[in-house]
Amino acid sequence: MDTKLLELLVCPVTKGPLTWNPEKQELCSRSARLAYPVRDGIPVLLENEARTLSDEELGL
């Protein structure tokens, strides 16, 4: 994930920052508890395409 692009992108639900998970190819929003997929290098920032992050994934 391009770091400059990551600095510009925000969670569409909370408008908060996103973190890159290279292992799962996802952009994660801790505040929304959502992980957005990245397909072919393109972030899919649609709430209905995101999966819910577990407490374990959030480190809770």
Curated annotation (Swiss-Prot):
Superkingdom, taxonomy of origin:
Bacteria
User: What is the taxonomic lineage of the source species?
Assistant: Bacteria, Pseudomonadati, Pseudomonadota, Betaproteobacteria, Burkholderiales
Indicate what this protein is called per its UniProt record.
Answer: UPF0434 protein Vapar_2640
Q: Which GO terms describe its cellular component?
A: cytosol
Q: Do you know which Gene3D superfamilies this protein is assigned to?
A: 2.20.25.10
Family from the record: Belongs to the UPF0434 family.
| PANTHER family, per the entry | PROTEIN PREY, MITOCHONDRIAL, ZGC:162634
